[in-house]
Amino acid sequence: MAEELTQTTQSITPSTGVVLLAFGKPQYYWATYNLVFSIRKHNPNVRITVLFEDTGKALSHCPEIVDYVENIGIIDAEDIYTNKKLDPGKVKINLYKYLPYDCNLYLDVDAIALKDIQPMIDELAQSGKQYISHCVGYHTIDKGRDFKEMQWAWADKMWAHFNLLESYVMPAINSSMQWIVKGSQTEAIYRTAKDLYFNNPIPIKELRMKWGGGQPDELYMNVALAIHGIDPALKTYTRNDGSEGGMIHFSMQRGLSFEKIVQNYYLQSYYGGAGFTPRFYIDWLDRMLNADFKAIGKRHIYLISRIAENKYADGKR
C-alpha cells in the first residue's frame, strides 16, 4: 500500500527543470558549459536539459557539458535553419514542443548563475502563472507608434498588420528568460505565435530593427500575449536598473556594484552582440569562474571575454 501511495504522489508532482538551447557557433556550446557549471556549482540538484543541434558537434566543441546536465535532446534541423541559414528566432518560436518538464525555466545560455537558482524557480512556481518572461514595458495603440521598450516594429504597423483590437495591451518581453508551465494556456500562446511567425510575418524589410536577416521571436510572442490577454510579468517585482528585480541582471552600462548584483539577482547576463555588455561585468564573470574552477582543480578554459567577442551580430549569422 505504501508503495502504491508513493507512486501516486510522484505521478502528480510536476517535474521542474532548466531548459537550454545550444546550436551554431562553438562559442554557444562554451557558454552553455559555463552556465550549467555555474548552476550546478551552487546547487547540484537542479535538473538541466540541453537541446543540441547535433550531439556529436556539441561534444566536439565542448565534451565537458555532459558532466553537468541531466538530459540531452536534439533540435530538428528544420527548426534551426531557414534557406540553409541559422535562424535563432525560429528555434525559440518552436520551443514549446521541446519542453521536457511540466514546469520549465528556459534561459538563454549567455548568462552565469551567481547563486542557487532554486529560490528563483520556487518563486516562479508559486506565482501560479503558466507563462512568465522578463517584461520591460507595455503599450497600447493610443500611446502612439513608438513603443519605446519594443524595438522590433512600430506599434501602428503591428496593430494594422495583425488586425489587433484597440483595447489590446501589448507587453515587451526579453525572451532570454521564460517560465513555461505546459498546459492549455501556454500551448495556445505558442500556437498563435507560430501561426503569426510562419503564416503572417511582417516582412523583414519593414521591421523597425533587423536581427541577422531573420525574424525575432519576441515580436510574435508579444503579439500572441496581447491577443490572449496574458501579462507575462511577475507582478511582485518592479523595474529596477532596467530589469525586473531579483531574477537576471541585464546591463548595457556600468551601474550596480558586484555586491549589489549578487544580492539582488540570481544570474548575470551578457546578452547582445559584441561590446553590448560592459567589459567591467565580463571580466568579473571570468574572475569568478576562474576561482570556481580552480577550487575543484580545473581550469577556466572557455573565457566569457572570448565568447562575448564572437557572438552573433545583428547583421551576420
Question: Where are the regions that the model predicts?
Answer:
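A glycosyltransferase accessory/donor-loop signature
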Residues: 2-16, 50, 159-317
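A conserved hydrophobic helix/loop-capping motif in glycosyltransferases and polysaccharide synthases
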Residues: 18-25
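Conserved glycosyltransferase catalytic-site signature
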Residues: 29-32, 89, 93, 175, ...
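Short internal beta-strands
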Residues: 48-54
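Short loop segments at secondary-structure junctions
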Residues: 55, 99-101, 181-185
